[in-house]
């Protein structure tokens, strides 16, 4: 028995049970809103304890990062292997206004790309956008068979791989530094940068499965409420965003 403990005083009345309080009665639900860059702006809901005294619920919500499948944001299963990170920057009533925080591939997609008899090329670069966001962009590519090739393997020489990697870094720096974060998001959805790398490296070595596999946000500028509201539209109540074009059109020949 513990020293100084009186069993008679600590014993409660028989038959009385402790009142069970549902913890959800002290919590509020908030709607997560994605930027208008994505077609579906309703990401989901999250909860937090209500504001009590000096503790404000909005302070606990700002900075939260949510990972969402791009297929849910775009309404297309073609993007199911990519994950988007959204960060809460502002609370408006029951709506959480988010901004782009990063991009990543699912592990099963990355494993499905790696095969034998081909060379893997990876490149990454740290670059600042036009609106002062510092990002680290990772690209991945694989060599493919050349036209009229008989040999089974498509391994590239180290010198060729260095040239391809240099070209990949050059294109990523150019494409990211000349646009804002919102414009970059519009490029990442239809994979404009990957197609540009594949097109530009044809003269060095033909590539396939060229993707921007990861984007990490390293540093962000001072928070600007005006730019965030512009990113979400004036009222920020629309459920649909604008559709991002793929950037190319099929050409139909009149005569063959």
UniProtKB/Swiss-Prot annotation:
PROSITE patterns: RIBOSOMAL_S3AE (PS01191). Keywords: Acetylation, Cytoplasm, Ribonucleoprotein, Ribosomal protein. It is found in: Cytoplasm. Its main location: cytoplasm. It comes from the Eukaryota. One of its GO terms (cellular component) is cytosolic small ribosomal subunit. Belongs to the eukaryotic ribosomal protein eS1 family. HAMAP family: Ribosomal_eS1_euk. Component of the small ribosomal subunit. Mature ribosomes consist of a small (40S) and a large (60S) subunit. The 40S subunit contains about 33 different proteins and 1 molecule of RNA (18S). The 60S subunit contains about 49 different proteins and 3 molecules of RNA (25S, 5.8S and 5S). PANTHER family: 40S RIBOSOMAL PROTEIN S3A. This is Small ribosomal subunit protein eS1. It comes from Candida tropicalis (strain ATCC MYA-3404 / T1).
